[in-house]
Regions:
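Signal peptide-proximal N-terminal region
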Residues: 49, 70-92, 182-187, 214-218
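Beta-alpha junction/loop-to-helix N-cap segments that form part of ligand/metal-binding clefts
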Residues: 27-31, 35-40, 63-68, 83-155, ...
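Extracellular/periplasmic periplasmic-binding protein-like sensory domains
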Residues: 166, 262-337, 349, 403-419
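C-terminal motif of bacterial Sec signal peptides marking the signal peptidase cleavage site
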Residues: 18-22
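Bacterial N-terminal signal peptides that target proteins for export
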Residues: 1-10
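Extracytoplasmic "Venus flytrap"
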Residues: 38-73, 95-102, 124-125, 195-204, ...
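Extracytoplasmic ligand/sensor domains, especially the bilobed periplasmic-binding protein
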Residues: 117-223, 273-298
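Segments of small-molecule ligand-sensing domains
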Residues: 323-333, 344-400
Length: 420
């Protein structure tokens, strides 16, 4: 759910994507499973099915890009160990888009026109997926992407685009908003402050929270958009402290913004009753080390994936990931694996890779069970579910909502004081 920065180059990139040269099953109701495992014990044979993707393996966004690569490659390995896709081995061709919009457009054009891939998987972030998905749409190829929840992804009338997480950016914090709205009057915040990144993903998260909390009766006392190059949040923290809001919500796209705002709030000595941050707290130890372990307690954030989630295939995925990489999967790795599961489910249901429209039509009409849970999509390719609501508690990351997925019965409220 960590998404990247908006650049002014996007109109040019979209123009390049949309002028690129074009290349050249029955629906079934119910939930299909993209398991990462085909017909167990069956040897894949024949010409490989080539799946193309470009990821930010270098540049500013290399950390989530490398994690996504791990997810894709684990899925490929498991599929090939268990009979392949439609009985054929899978070959994933991954290019490095260098965290650059122009490069990602060139990469997907090359994958389609030169590498002659049969299928596509998406890149990381709304920033890169907006132009990349335009290349896929122009070429009438299914485009399942693991990390691009900006509203701008879904307002273009695309038929082949699908986002393989639970919800789009404006709805990332729906469970937080619902929880706040349901608090007793003596616990419910009266005033709110919103720190909004100028970013196609992070901005809509904070704006969605503000809209929801205002509808719940929370008065807005501070709401400002900050530029993506902001490093020092001291002035923002001081302005917020002067307004004394009960709840603070930040919408950003990565680790650094959230860490720096928290440090500044600690510095000015202002502690809200409730504190929600998009993206940053999900960076686990990097967030904890950045803000200080004692300053994580009570911080809310949204998650697409948690290692302890009781979702279909998650236990097997977790074990396989640890065995292959000797580490727990990052959220971005799980998101990429789930995107591949969605692609697999469509191909297996249709029984062919020759009709991309049939694959898209099947996904529009059906649900798919993944390690993130059951996913379904509206006519724009936007998902229709809800993210998990998580909270840092005593140095641990806990799922607090929904109740049937919670790893604890406790929600820390109000937030404990900062530890200087």
């Amino acid at each position: 759910m960590r998404r990247l920065l908006w650049l002014l180059a996007l109109p040019l990139v979209l123009a390049l994507a949309l002028t690129a040269a074009a290349c050249g099953g029955d629906d079934e109701e119910g939930a299909a499973t993209g398991t990462g495992t085909g017909a167990t014990g069956t040897q894949a044979s024949g010409e490989p099915i080539k799946i193309g993707a470009s990821l930010p393996l270098t540049g500013d966004f290399s950390e989530p890009g490398v994690a996504a690569k791990q997810g894709y490659e684990l899925w490929q390995e498991q599929v090939n160990q268990n009979g392949g896709l439609l009985g054929r081995p899978v070959e994933i061709v991954i290019k490095d888009d260098q965290s650059d919009q122009n490069v990602v457009v060139a990469d997907y054009n090359a994958l389609i026109q030169q590498d002659k891939v049969d299928l596509l998987l998406g890149t990381f972030s709304s920033l890169l997926n907006i132009p990349a998905s335009a290349v896929a749409e122009r070429n009438q190829m299914l485009y399942v992407e693991p990390a691009g929840g900006s509203p701008e992804m879904f307002n273009r009338g695309f038929q082949y685009l699908f986002f393989a997480q639970q919800a789009t950016a404006p709805h990332q914090a729906d469970l937080f908003v619902e929880w706040v709205g349901g608090l007793p009057d003596d616990e419910k915040p009266k005033t709110g402050a919103y720190v909004i990144a100028d970013d196609p993903f992070g901005g809509p998260v904070a704006e969605g929270i503000q809209k929801g909390l205002e509808a719940a009766g929370v008065q807005t006392v501070y709401s400002e958009v900050y530029p993506p190059e902001t490093k020092n949040f001291d002035a923002i923290a001081s302005a917020i402290a002067a307004k004394k809001p009960d709840v603070i919500a930040q919408g950003s796209a990565g680790l650094e913004d959230g860490v720096n705002l928290t440090r500044s709030l600690v510095k000015v000595g202002y502690n809200p009753k409730q504190y929600f941050q998009a993206s940053s707290p999900s960076f686990a130890d990097q967030y904890s080390n950045g803000v200080g372990a004692g300053n994580t307690d009570g911080v809310f954030y949204a998650l697409s994936y948690h290692p302890e989630a009781e979702t279909p295939g998650n236990t097997e995925f977790l074990e396989a990931f640890k065995a292959k990489y000797d580490a727990e999967p990052a959220e971005d790795a799980a998101d990429a694996y789930a995107a591949a599961q969605v692609l697999q489910a469509a191909v297996e249901a249709v029984g062919s890779i020759d009709d991309q429209k049939a694959l898209a039509d099947w996904l529009h009409a059906n649900e798919v069970e993944t390690i993130l849970g059951t996913l379904s999509w509206d006519e724009t390719g936007a998902p229709e579910q809800a993210f998990l609501l998580a909270q840092w508690q005593n140095g641990n990351e806990e799922i607090v909502l929904p109740e049937d997925a919670a790893t604890t019965d406790t929600i820390v409220n109000p937030k404990p004081d900062w530890q200087q």
